[in-house]
């Protein structure tokens, strides 16, 4: 006879099924809809039904869950359990919850999907029960359901969790935990449930990380020796770190947490603990700023644990066990923190990262030795055998990305020989170059549907490019020599294919890329080939400059239609893509990667054209049309909204044509101040009799070496209440200082940009070096931008620091006189105020420029009253000094602010909006309008108060815009009586907007 589980015969199953329905029939009731539902409040009947369900389920396992009897019974079983749980009879709900757990483990999620909402609704209220035998199985059952909830149902499930205050209940349970009152298992299951909720629903995270009591409990629990408690806490921290605000909160108080995390990553910890430790570190490193914050606290120990995890593993019967593979994958993901600059790079080399990476490429690497005296030809032959063996293919892309990032961030003086890692590094370079060469040879055969192969091709190609561009002369030259050797056979033939493919894209008339992976490999290949002189000459003869320029122009026209360029495995899993509240610095090769690779190739060709023997006059002697087109396109990219990588390389190439730096709006404003001597307080006198007028505060920030020693810093500051008397200090310059070179240096100091003729270049370089103008010197020397460098800002906000505040010549006073906890670090004044500089204020505001020049009494006072709140004044000052208006709190911080706090934020922007009209600052007014409307988009309930506020300032454009945001909720506002507070004119305005919204199909 057939059996279902453990010897249970069909007859026995039928008997239990009969008993099940005998019990269920005691509670079936016919409802109004004439539908049969299970409804019985009798505790004994409920207990009998639960036991009958349990006995019936004992006959089955997940493998036999397709049995007709169980499939036909699911609806009735689920209905009975939902009602019993909903009745909240403590004597039976614990038993029922345990049966739900067994049901979930046996029946596939696809079959139980229809009942998930009802089960969630019945289980959630029971979590607040203090009975261990009730709350524990309810937490386990609810977690099992939530893990398998379909994305289409997530909104409905969250509504139930929110209504039942599920997060509040679980947080409360965790807060009362102690080893004496509740078991470790209880804490683990509650923590696991909360972790699952935070993974799926970002809305839940704020109430967790913003709960100091809970965070204190977690810190206390994490210090206990029980590994089960530690792993549960790690899971909670990991889910919490999906929120950027939560991650920062963890890091702000993070030393104990980080110590625990790294301790769990050690070899002595359990596999589960090690994986959770690695995952937490990855999530804390989601953003550049947060990653560096973590690294500054535990750099060496974090890197040591990561590298040792990557290098210490073993094969079982020639294979890597699944749990070891999972551990290696997580360690490799964490090692991708090498994509950012920082002190951690030193420790990766210290702990022999090359050796660890090579062990993931070469099978039985530790039992082999690399002969340091073999020829490059022999090394390539060995590398071919290694790549053909295809050892651990799923990790290969991580290997190439990690070594590529390490190479890109090396220092110029880096020398692997001294670090004892030369042989391993050399062999990795050879393997990467060989893998890249194979990708180029594949040409049209590259298949982007094969994700593993595609990611290998892309990441190896990019790694070689990073090696070639490495600041380390050792790595860069090694990569070039190796690649040149490997490309000798069939090099020009393969290159010709790349040229043809790349020239086809802009000439095809299409607006999408024909093959994303092939385009990536082609562009990276173009850049790598261009770095080798003989191939650069070949490309130039094939009109490579024109082809790349055409591609850049095509990209500019079609960038909205171009998708991602990466097939490499991401450090983020599907759940980690549910991050919130993160402000992440873009990776260089994430945004506009195709454009970046094209510009890298263009940079190599331009460099070769200027310095190559055969093409020394390539650009200067050709028709001016190419040069003009090239410079125009590069300026558009440099000044556009593209990624930092393309903008940096556009600026780098422009340096060959005499254009240095980046044009900023703030820089243009400051240049106006430089050209206007009205506010200058220092004059540089030259031996020739000429002079240059400057502003001490700007020079102190941007080029302090030009200041007399006593002017650079001031130990204390006092603000005079007397009328300001401007004095001009005269400084005699050495006769050795070239006037034009110094003027160009000053232009760059003020604006961040300068155009220099070749005749002045040689004199400007030593001056820039002496004055420590690093960015300018880098461009004058035509050094490649360092991978990952951000666009240099004009750091005028430094003028507001205590060290330089003695240059302040005006105080801004808000309309508020009492601000809680106000304390000025700059002076002894106790009322709210902000120190500032007339030159900065007048450069950004025509009204203030005219006021300070008017000769009226106000123009001489050291105080200027500004009709905005203290919060508004801080935002206004920030705009003057950075040309950026600070944004209000974002993400879950904004969503969880009360209405009053949100209105305070909005009021500051409305005040500045009104002031900017009076002070004739159209750009600032537009910025304010954008922020205000963005806030109303996410909180339409603020529209009425915003309308009232804007109307009080007679800001009718803003009133109209706010009315449009209130239009979708007009009927709700009318019924609630909120419109009764407004004037009839304003109500009519909202009503009209609502009618228009309705007519447009809203």
Curated annotation (Swiss-Prot):
The BTB/POZ domain mediates the interaction with some component of ubiquitin ligase complexes. This is BTB/POZ domain-containing protein At1g04390. May act as a substrate-specific adapter of an E3 ubiquitin-protein ligase complex (CUL3-RBX1-BTB) which mediates the ubiquitination and subsequent proteasomal degradation of target proteins. Pfam families: BTB (PF00651). Pathway: Protein modification; protein ubiquitination. Residues 680-758, 808-889 form the BTB domain. One of its GO terms (biological process) is protein ubiquitination. Keywords: Repeat, Ubl conjugation pathway. The keyword Repeat applies. The keyword Repeat applies. CDD domains: BTB_POZ_ZBTB_KLHL-like. It comes from the Eukaryota.
């Amino acid at each position: 006879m057939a059996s279902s589980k453990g010897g249970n015969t069909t007859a026995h199953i039928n008997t239990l099924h009969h008993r099940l329905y005998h019990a269920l029939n005691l509670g079936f009731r016919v409802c109004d809809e004439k539908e049969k539902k299970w409804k019985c409040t009798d505790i004994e009947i409920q207990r009998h039904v639960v036991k009958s369900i349990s006995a019936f389920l004992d006959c089955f396992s997940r493998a036999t869950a397709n049995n007709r009897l169980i499939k036909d019974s699911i609806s009735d079983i689920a209905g009975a359990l939902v009602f019993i749980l909903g009745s909240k009879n403590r004597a039976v709900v614990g038993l029922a919850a345990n049966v739900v757990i067994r049901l979930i483990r046996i029946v596939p999620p696809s079959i139980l999907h229809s009942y998930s909402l009802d089960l969630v609704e019945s289980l959630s209220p029971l979590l607040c029960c203090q009975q261990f035998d009730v709350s524990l199985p309810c937490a386990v059952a609810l977690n099992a359901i939530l893990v398998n909830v379909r994305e289409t149902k997530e909104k409905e499930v969250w509504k139930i969790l929110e209504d039942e205050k599920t997060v509040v209940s679980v947080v409360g349970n965790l807060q009362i935990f102690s080893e004496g009152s509740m078991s470790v298992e209880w804490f683990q299951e509650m923590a696991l449930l909360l972790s699952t909720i935070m993974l799926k629903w970002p809305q839940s995270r704020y109430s967790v990380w913003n709960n100091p009591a809970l965070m204190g409990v977690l810190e206390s629990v994490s210090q206990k020796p029980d590994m089960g408690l530690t792993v549960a806490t790690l899971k909670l921290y990991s889910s919490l770190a999906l929120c950027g605000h939560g991650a920062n909160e963890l890091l702000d108080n993070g030393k104990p947490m980080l110590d625990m995390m790294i301790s769990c990553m050690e070899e002595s910890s359990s596999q589960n603990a090690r994986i959770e430790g690695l995952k937490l570190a990855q999530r804390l490193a989601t953003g550049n700023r947060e990653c560096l914050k973590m690294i500054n606290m535990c750099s060496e120990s974090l890197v040591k644990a990561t590298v040792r995890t990557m290098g210490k593993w073993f094969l079982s019967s020639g294979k890597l066990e699944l749990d070891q593979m999972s551990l290696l994958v997580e360690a490799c993901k964490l090692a991708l923190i090498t994509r950012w600059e920082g002190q951690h790079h030193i420790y990766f080399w210290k702990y022999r990262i090359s050796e660890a990476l090579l062990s993931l490429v070469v099978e039985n690497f530790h039992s082999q030795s690399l002969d340091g005296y073999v020829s490059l030809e022999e090394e390539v032959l060995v590398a071919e055998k290694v790549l053909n063996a295809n050892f651990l293919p799923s990790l290969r892309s991580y290997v190439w990305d990690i070594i590529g990032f390490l190479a890109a961030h090396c220092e110029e003086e880096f020398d692997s020989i001294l670090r004892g890692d030369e042989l391993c590094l050399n062999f990795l370079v050879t393997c990467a170059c060989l893998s890249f060469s194979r990708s180029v040879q594949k040409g049209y055969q590259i298949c982007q549907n094969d994700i593993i192969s595609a990611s290998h091709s892309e990441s190896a190609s990019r790694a070689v490019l990073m090696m070639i561009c490495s600041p380390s002369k050792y790595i860069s030259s090694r990569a070039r020599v190796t690649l040149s050797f490997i490309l000798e056979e069939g090099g020009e033939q393969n290159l010709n294919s790349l040229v043809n493919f790349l020239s086809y894209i802009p000439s095809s008339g299409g607006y999408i890329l024909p093959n994303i992976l092939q385009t990536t490999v082609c562009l990276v290949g173009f850049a790598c080939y261009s770095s080798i002189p003989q191939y650069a000459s070949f490309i130039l003869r094939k009109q490579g400059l024109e082809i790349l320029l055409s591609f850049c122009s095509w990209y500019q026209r079609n960038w909205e239609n171009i998708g991602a360029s990466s097939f490499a495995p991401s450090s983020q899993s599907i759940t980690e893509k549910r991050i919130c509240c993160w402000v992440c610095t873009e990776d260089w090769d994430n945004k506009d990667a195709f454009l970046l690779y094209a510009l890298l190739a263009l940079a190599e060709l331009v460099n070769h054209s200027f310095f190559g023997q055969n093409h020394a006059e390539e650009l200067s002697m050709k028709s001016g049309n190419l040069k003009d087109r090239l410079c125009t396109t590069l300026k558009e990219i440099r000044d556009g909204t593209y990624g930092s990588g393309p903008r940096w390389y556009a600026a780098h190439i422009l340096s060959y044509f005499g254009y240095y730096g980046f044009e900023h709006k703030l820089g243009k404003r400051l240049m106006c101040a430089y050209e206007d001597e009205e506010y200058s307080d220092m004059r540089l006198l030259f031996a020739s009799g000429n002079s240059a007028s400057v502003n001490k505060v700007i020079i102190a920030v941007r080029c302090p070496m030009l200041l007399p020693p006593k002017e650079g810093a001031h130990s204390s500051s006092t603000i005079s209440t007397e009328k300001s008397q401007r004095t001009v200090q005269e400084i005699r310059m050495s006769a050795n200082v070239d006037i034009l070179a110094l003027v160009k240096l000053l232009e760059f100091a003020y604006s961040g940009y300068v155009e220099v003729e070749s005749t002045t270049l040689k004199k400007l370089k030593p001056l820039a070096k002496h004055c420590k103008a690093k960015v300018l010197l880098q461009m004058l020397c035509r050094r490649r931008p360092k991978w990952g460098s951000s666009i240099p800002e004009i750091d005028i906000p430094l003028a507001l620091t205590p060290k330089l505040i003695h240059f302040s010549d005006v105080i801004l006073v808000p309309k508020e006189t009492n601000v809680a906890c106000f304390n000025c670090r700059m002076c002894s004044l106790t009322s709210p105020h902000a120190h500032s500089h007339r030159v900065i204020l007048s450069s950004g505001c025509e009204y203030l420029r005219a006021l300070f020049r008017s000769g009226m009494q106000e123009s001489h006072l050291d105080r200027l009253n500004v009709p905005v709140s203290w919060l508004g004044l801080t935002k206004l000052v920030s705009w003057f000094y950075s040309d950026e208006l600070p944004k209000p709190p974002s993400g879950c911080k904004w969503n969880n602010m009360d209405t009053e706090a949100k209105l305070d934020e909005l009021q500051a922007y409305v005040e500045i909006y009104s002031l900017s009209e009076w002070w004739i600052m159209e750009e600032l007014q537009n910025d304010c309008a954008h922020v205000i409307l963005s806030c109303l988009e996410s909180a339409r309930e603020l529209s009425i108060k915003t309308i009232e506020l804007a109307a009080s300032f007679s800001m009718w454009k803003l009133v109209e815009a706010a009315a449009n945001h209130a239009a979708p909720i007009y009927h709700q506002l009318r019924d609630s009586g909120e419109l009764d507070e407004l004037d009839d004119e304003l109500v009519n305005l909202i009503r009209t907007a609502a009618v228009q919204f309705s007519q447009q199909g809203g």
